[in-house]
Amino acid sequence: MTFSPEPAYQHGQAPRTAILLVNLGTPDAPTPKAVGRYLKEFLSDPRVVEIPRLAWLPLLYGVILPLRARASALKYESIWLREAHMTGSPLLVYSERQAHALQRLLNQQGYELTVACAMRYGNPSIASVLEALRRQGTEQVLVLPMYPQYSGTTTATAFDEVFRVLGQWRNQPEIRLVKHFHDHPAYIAALHQQVGAYWAQHGTPDFARGDKLILSFHGVPRRTLELGDPYHCECLKTGRLLGDALGLQPGQYQVTFQSRFGKAEWLQPYTAPTLAELGKVGAGRVDVFCPGFPADCIETLEEIAMEGQTEFMVAGGKTFHFIPCMNDAQPWISALAEIALQHVQGWPLNMPHAHELEARRSRAQTRGAAA
C-alpha cells in the first residue's frame, strides 16, 4: 500500500484544531442523474443496507436506482432553495450556516478553532474536507456527527469514512469522536426553545382537548435494535426529556419513526400511519417536530411538512403544524459550542503568538530547513 504525500511542511506554521461537523449528504442538484449518483453511494454502504452484496447490488442497480432516482428528484425539486441568500439543497445550506455560526461564536468566545462541515455521501465529501484541513496545518480534529442519537447506520459509517481517509495519510492528526449527545442538557434545552419559540408565534396546542405533539425520528430496521444498536433507546430518551422540559404528560406527545424503506419491519410506531390515525379520530391539531434532525432536509421539509400534512388532513384531521428544525438558531449553535468544547478539553484552542512562531521558523532554518 502506498500513502499519499504530505503537503510541504512550513516551519513556524501554527498548528490548528478543527471541529468537523458531519451530516448524511445530499445530491448536487435536484435532477435524476445527480440524485441517482447520490443514492448509489448512499445505498451501497453496507452499514446502511445489511444485505449480502451479491443479493443487494443487482437489485439496487437494476431496479431501485432506475425507479427511485426520478421520483426522488421531483421531491428534491419541491424543497430546493432558490432565494438570493440561500440557494441549493436545504441540508447543505443549513449545514454550512451552522458551521459558520459555530465558527463565529467560538471566535467571539476567544477560541481560535476551525469549523468545517462535510457530508458522508455526496459533497463536500469527508475526504475533501479533511484534505483541506490537512493543508491548513490541522493537527487535531474533533469529528462531530450531526446525529444526536447514535446508530451504526449513521454515526458509525461517518467514523468509518474518517478512518478510511486517514488510513491513507502518512502524517495523521489526533482524532476525537463525539458518539452521541441525545441526552445532553444543552441539546435538550435547544430543542425546548425551538418548540417554545414556535408555539409562542403560532399558539400552543390545546392538549386538554386532545391536540398532540408528534416527535418523529428517522427510522431504522427493527433488526438493528435486536442486534444491539442503541438508537431506539436513545430516541425514546430524547423524547422523554423533551416532553418533560415542555411540561407535557406522556399522552400529550408521542415518539414515532419515519422514512421506512423496503418491506422489512422497522422501528415502530410509524409516523405516517400515526398521522392518518389521528386524522381519522378527528384530532383538532397535530404538531410534528423532528428532534433527531438538527437541520431541515428532504425528510422534514417534504416527507413531514408536505406528505405528513396530506396524510393527516385527508384522513380527517383539522390543523397540522410542522415545527422547523433548529438549523442555525442561536440556542442550538450555543448548545453545539458547549458540546464541542467539552470534547476538545486539553487540546490547544488558541494560536501561538506570532513571535513564537517566527522563533520556531528561525531555529528550523538554522538547522538547515528550507522553509
UniProtKB/Swiss-Prot annotation:
One of its GO terms (biological process) is heme biosynthetic process. InterPro entries: Ferrochelatase (IPR001015), Ferrochelatase_AS (IPR019772), Ferrochelatase_C (IPR033644), Ferrochelatase_N (IPR033659). Pathway: Porphyrin-containing compound metabolism; protoheme biosynthesis; protoheme from protoporphyrin-IX: step 1/1. Its main location: cytoplasm. CDD domains: Ferrochelatase_C, Ferrochelatase_N. Fe cation binds at residues 218, 299. Disulfide bonds: none annotated. It holds the Pfam family Ferrochelatase. Its EC number is 4.98.1.1. One of its GO terms (molecular function) is metal ion binding. It catalyses: heme b + 2 H(+) = protoporphyrin IX + Fe(2+). GO terms for cellular component: cytoplasm. Keywords: Cytoplasm, Heme biosynthesis, Iron, Lyase, Metal-binding, Porphyrin biosynthesis. Signal peptide: none annotated. It is found in: Cytoplasm. Catalyzes the ferrous insertion into protoporphyrin IX. PANTHER family: FERROCHELATASE, FERROCHELATASE, MITOCHONDRIAL. Belongs to the ferrochelatase family. This is Ferrochelatase.
